[in-house]
């Protein structure tokens, strides 16, 4: 497990996907650093990214207070199907069905309903689109259900309507900011797939393929001849790549055949 920072009070780590944030991660921190470890916030099992843990009771109290008061800012990146607006500020009422472990957007407050707010900025002009999100409330499945309810399910999120080959939602805790001893600490880490420039290049090449005029096909051929596509389609450290944008024209398996077609 990767450490971004640690001292006698704090440990900031990159939680891997599939590791439980309330048991396995603290155990790994203790095994590496010794002492104690206290959980002050959590991530779902299927979500990776930046987390902070307290190593003393005093630090745990201070960090928990930051969470409760909203001074711990949590930001995420994700890939969503479709292309949402450039930015947004969404507030919804969410209701969780515990038996199904699924959350739904409802139209009015009632027993069991919680309000949920996030803001976001779209970082790429592609489909799927790269989006950066700030959470103002930490509701169960909040990001997943708020985007899915607007017909932009997360790539890989089959529970909330995605129909693609990815095995888990492409959602990552990319940044934590919080007050600490009179100053503000900020820790940021991006996964390999959160590359807006790469997504825009792939989207532009798909658009060129769709248009199929001589200039576009020449640009597409040059892109493939240059070898740039190899870097654009490399898998990240978790083996997940946004390999097929809208229709998967430029998947690795199809590049050779596509190049032959372009050269006709």
Which ranges hold each PLM region?
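Short, surface-exposed linear segments at secondary-structure transitions and domain or protein termini
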Residues: 164, 193-194
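Small/polar loops that bind or transfer phosphate-bearing groups
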Residues: 55, 135, 226
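RNA pseudouridine synthases
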Residues: 1-117, 121-126, 148, 170, ...
């Amino acid at each position: 497990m990767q450490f971004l920072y640690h001292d006698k009070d704090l440990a900031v780590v990159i939680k891997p996907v599939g590791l439980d944030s309330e048991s396995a991660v603290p155990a790994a921190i203790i095994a590496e650093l010794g002492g104690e470890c206290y959980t002050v916030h959590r991530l779902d099992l299927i979500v990776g990214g930046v987390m902070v843990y307290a190593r003393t009771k005093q630090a745990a109290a201070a960090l928990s207070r930051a969470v409760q008061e909203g001074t711990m800012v949590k930001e995420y990146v994700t890939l969503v199907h479709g292309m949402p607006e450039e930015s947004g500020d969404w507030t919804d009422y969410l209701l969780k069905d515990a038996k199904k472990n699924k959350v739904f957007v409802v139209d009015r407050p009632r027993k069991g309903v919680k309000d949920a707010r996030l803001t976001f900025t779209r970082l790429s002009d592609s489909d799927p689109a790269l989006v950066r999100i700030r959470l103002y409330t930490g509701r169960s499945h909040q990001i997943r259900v708020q985007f899915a309810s607007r017909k932009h399910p997360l790539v890989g999120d089959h529970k909330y309507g995605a129909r693609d080959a990815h095995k888990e939602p492409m959602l990552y805790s990319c940044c934590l900011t919080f007050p600490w001893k009179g100053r503000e600490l900020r820790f940021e880490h991006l996964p390999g797939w959160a590359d807006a420039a790469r997504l825009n290049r792939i989207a532009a090449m798909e658009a060129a393929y769709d248009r199929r005029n001589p200039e576009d096909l020449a640009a597409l051929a040059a892109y493939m001849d240059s070898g740039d596509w190899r870097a654009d389609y490399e898998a990240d450290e978790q083996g997940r790549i946004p390999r097929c944008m809208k229709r998967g024209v430029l998947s690795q398996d199809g590049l050779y055949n596509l190049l032959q077609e372009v050269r006709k």
